[in-house]
């Protein structure tokens, strides 16, 4: 079965949130079969930075990326989640 690579942009609640710690909280919250394969940090404005996560998830997930988005939104310190791209990986 193929996997799906999702590029997820995560905005923190506050500019003082440590994005490395936030990434680890998200990693721990992900369900089985989901895996952070990489990340980068994107400056937004006025000191605010976004965490861009590259996440592998199962292809046959009911609801598409919605369960992933909901899981990440429920992590403490996350203000907003946006799917930037979705790619099927064979």
Curated annotation (Swiss-Prot):
Keywords annotated in UniProt: Elongation factor, Protein biosynthesis
Listed InterPro entries: eEF-1beta-like_sf, EF1B_bsu/dsu_GNE, Transl_elong_EF1B/ribsomal_bS6, Transl_elong_EF1B_B_arc
Any Pfam family: EF1_GNE
The keyword Transmembrane helix appears for this protein: no
Domain of life: Archaea
Entry-linked CDD domains: EF1B
GO MF, any single term: translation elongation factor activity
Keyword check for Protein biosynthesis: yes
Purpose: Promotes the exchange of GDP for GTP in EF-1-alpha/GDP, thus allowing the regeneration of EF-1-alpha/GTP that could then be used to form the ternary complex EF-1-alpha/GTP/AAtRNA.
Family the UniProt entry places it in: Belongs to the EF-1-beta/EF-1-delta family.
Name by which UniProt lists this protein: Elongation factor 1-beta
Gene: ef1b
């Amino acid at each position: 079965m193929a996997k799906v690579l999702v590029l997820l942009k995560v905005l923190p609640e506050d500019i003082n949130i440590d994005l490395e710690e936030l990434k680890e909280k998200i990693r721990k919250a992900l369900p089985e079969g989901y895996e952070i394969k990489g990340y980068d940090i994107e400056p937004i404005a006025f000191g605010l930075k976004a965490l861009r996560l590259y996440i592998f998830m199962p292809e046959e997930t009911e609801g598409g990326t919605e369960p992933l988005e909901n899981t990440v939104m429920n992590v403490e310190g996350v203000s907003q989640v946006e799917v930037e791209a979705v790619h099927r990986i064979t």
